[in-house]
Swiss-Prot record:
Region called Disordered, residue ranges: 222-252
Protein name according to UniProt: 29 kDa protein
Organism name: Tobacco rattle virus (strain PSG)
One matching Pfam family: MP
Species classification: Viruses, Riboviria, Orthornavirae, Kitrinoviricota, Alsuviricetes
Length: 252
């Protein structure tokens, strides 16, 4: 049975939060440095009219203001991803669309971990939404402004005036922190950084309690030429990278 206080917090968050409120929120004391983590959610309309061939697009979720706030922390973690694909095609339209959230640091020779999260949908779905919890960390010594891209491809979808009429929107929930530990369920559930845009309270509760929730059944069986590996490491940081970054921050 879920703790009632967590239910209340989640309900309050869902009802009063506005997705357009993009200000960073300081919550929780973080490790030995005794300072807060930064929690943030940012929405980005990636592109409209996705073409029928492989394409990668920079995800401009982070800006210089964000970087100034997080650069004194050791790590940046992506803890939540929401993908929204809107189609304006008729209900009987064939074909599929595939969206990949990519780590641009990984080259073609290192495809194994390039795809952080994959989303597939039928081309005729009016609006497909998927929300995922992830745990993906990078050092803030990296160029965090250019790390993430979105890979898109559609298969078997009729061309309409030279374009494929899809719109794609990506939302990321991220945390700047000095800690390497995973965020626990209580922190995720009680944090105001989880904001809005869930279809109903029941789905919101499921998203907060399960490792992964797809809000709509995705039936696509994509088998096209663009297939980055679906597996990904829990973190791209080796233990030595973590230790080195932590020591550098603690000595500054």
């Amino acid at each position: 049975m879920e703790d009632k206080s967590l239910v209340t917090l989640k309900k309050k968050t869902f009802e009063v939060s506005k997705f357009s409120n993009l200000g960073a929120i300081e919550l929780f004391v973080d490790g030995r440095r005794k300072r807060p983590k930064y929690f943030h959610r940012r929405r980005e309309t990636v592109l409209n009219h996705v073409g029928g061939k492989k394409s990668e697009h920079k995800l401009d979720v982070f800006d210089q203001r964000d970087y100034k706030m997080i650069k004194s922390y050791a790590f940046l973690k992506i803890v939540g991803v929401q993908l929204v694909v809107t189609s304006h095609l008729p209900a009987d339209t064939p074909g599929f669309i595939q969206i990949d959230l990519l780590d641009s640091r990984l080259t073609e020779k290192r495809k194994k971990g390039k795809t952080i999260q994959r989303f597939k949908a039928r081309a005729c779905d009016n609006c497909s939404v998927a929300q995922y919890k992830v745990e993906y960390s990078i050092s803030t010594q990296e160029n965090v402004l250019d790390v993430w891209k979105v890979g898109c491809i559609s298969e078997g979808v009729p061309v309409c005036d030279g374009t494929y009429p899809f719109s794609i929107e990506v939302s990321l929930i991220w945390v700047a922190t000095d800690s390497t530990r995973r965020l626990n369920v209580e922190e995720l559930n009680s944090s105001d950084y989880i904001e809005g845009d869930f279809t109903d309270q029941e789905v919101f509760g499921e998203f907060m309690s399960l490792k992964q929730v797809e809000m709509k059944t995705i039936e696509a069986k994509y088998d096209g030429p663009y297939r980055p590996a679906t597996t990904r490491p829990k973190s791209l940081l080796s233990s030595e990278d973590v230790k080195r970054a932590s020591n550098k921050k603690n000595s500054s």
